[in-house]
């Protein structure tokens, strides 16, 4: 939940990765990133910096509940002095519930997550060795708490998942 990456191990022992660089560089597809996106989208809307096409009301309520804050400024302690990445990522569980209840902003964050997770896999495809595909040994294993909410991003994941026969030249 606090990070996201994809790893490839080829038959010759070579490894390749995509993502997993941490929250400062990019953890797209992780619970932390979804929490960050929810806060960013909500705050940008409330600042009138980048108005959201979806209501941010429910997400703001969830942020207030999760971080036990009443004003927007109070989030700063959780982003800096008291930063706790697993706690921050814990907001994602509340976002999942709101998405299941129909909140459009939360649903959009999960759709975006499906795209990111598919892109992790797509990024590694050029590195897949022919032997791995020929033997039928190419398995994609999905682990982590974000996958417990696969129903919320399955459509966007599969839409963006590579439709390929893996003809590698």
Functional labels for PLM-detected ranges:
Residues 40-169:
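ATP-binding/phosphotransfer module of carbohydrate and carboxylate kinases, centering on a glycine-rich
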Residues 1-57:
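Phosphate-binding/catalytic loop of phosphoryl-transfer enzymes
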């Amino acid at each position: 939940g606090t990070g996201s990456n994809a790893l490839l191990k080829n038959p010759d022992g070579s490894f390749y990765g995509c993502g997993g660089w941490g929250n400062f560089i990019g953890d797209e597809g992780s619970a932390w990133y979804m929490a960050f996106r929810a806060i960013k989208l909500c705050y940008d809307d409330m600042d009138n910096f980048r108005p959201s096409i979806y209501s941010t009301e429910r997400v703001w309520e969830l942020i207030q509940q999760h971080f036990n804050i009443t004003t927007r400024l109070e989030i700063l302690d959780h982003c800096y002095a008291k930063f706790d990445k697993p706690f921050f990522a814990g907001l994602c569980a509340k976002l999942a519930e709101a998405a299941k209840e129909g909140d459009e902003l939360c649903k959009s964050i999960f759709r975006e997550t499906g795209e990111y997770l598919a892109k992790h896999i797509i990024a590694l495809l050029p590195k897949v060795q022919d032997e791995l595909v020929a033997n039928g040994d190419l398995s994609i294993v999905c682990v982590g708490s974000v996958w417990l909410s696969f129903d919320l991003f399955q459509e966007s994941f599969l839409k963006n998942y590579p439709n390929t026969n893996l003809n590698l030249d």
